[in-house]
Each structure stands twice: as structure tokens, then as C-alpha cells.
Amino acid sequence: MPTPHTFSRELRLLTPEHFKRVFAEPVRAASPQITLLACPNTLEHPRLGLAVPKKALKRAVWRNRVKRVVRESFRLNQASLPAIDIVVIAKGGVKEMDNEELFKLLEKLWRTLSRRCNG
């Protein structure tokens, strides 16, 4: 497993097949601004994929900010997550949130997802 608190290539969902697997039978944790989908993986660590559509967040600056905050939150919380593949889907309401609010919301969603995936 990679050292704690990194976000290396092996911690990312990279191919369309990885994303399709998560979308096929997901465990959900959602808020009006963000949805997290997850499914178990055969690895010993969680992996993250991001879906931040232009339709929800028109400006690249907004999309990049959301991705940056999600990656940082995942990086700091990955040790407490089970071996699951996670796809984060941003919705339009996320652009009104500041970084601190988004970070707190993500921590709550990580805990919810962890509980649902562990039984």
C-alpha cells in the first residue's frame, strides 16, 4: 500500500472500465451538492475517480477547485476508508459552497460511505 497521505496513480480510477464497474452496482452517499458512488475492490486500498461535468459547473476554475478540494479530502481520509472504488459526482449547488464547507461535507460523506460499505 502507498504511504499514508499521498495521492499516487494507484489511488485513482483511470480507465472507463473502472468507472463502469462503480456505476453498475453502487453504494451511495449523497447530498444536494455531491454524490459519492462506491463498490468494493480487490485491492487493499481505496481508489478515487472524479466526475465534474461542465453542465453543472460551467467554468473551468469552478471545476478545478472542486476537484482539488475532493482530492485533498480523499488524501487526508483514505486511511479510514475501506478497500473501495469511489466516484465523486459534483452537482451545480457545489459552486456556492466555500472550500471549508465542501471539506466538512466530504468528511461526513466519507464516514457515511465507510459505514455503508463495512456492513
UniProtKB/Swiss-Prot annotation:
> What is a biological process (GO) this protein takes part in?
tRNA 5'-leader removal
Specify the signal sequence span: none
Keyword tRNA processing found: yes
Q: Which Gene Ontology molecular-function terms are recorded?
A: 3'-tRNA processing endoribonuclease activity; ribonuclease P activity; tRNA binding
**Keyword annotations of the record:** Endonuclease, Hydrolase, Nuclease, RNA-binding, tRNA processing
Task: Provide the catalytic activity annotation.
Answer: Endonucleolytic cleavage of RNA, removing 5'-extranucleotides from tRNA precursor
- Supply the SUPFAM superfamilies for this chain: Ribosomal protein S5 domain 2-like
Q: What Pfam families does the entry give?
A: Ribonuclease_P
Q: Name one GO cellular component term.
A: ribonuclease P complex
The protein's role, per its UniProt record: RNaseP catalyzes the removal of the 5'-leader sequence from pre-tRNA to produce the mature 5'-terminus. It can also cleave other RNA substrates such as 4.5S RNA. The protein component plays an auxiliary but essential role in vivo by binding to the 5'-leader sequence and broadening the substrate specificity of the ribozyme.
Cite the record's note on assembly: Consists of a catalytic RNA component (M1 or rnpB) and a protein subunit.
Similarity field? Belongs to the RnpA family.
Its name, as the record gives it, is: Ribonuclease P protein component
Q: Which organism is it from?
A: Aeromonas salmonicida (strain A449)
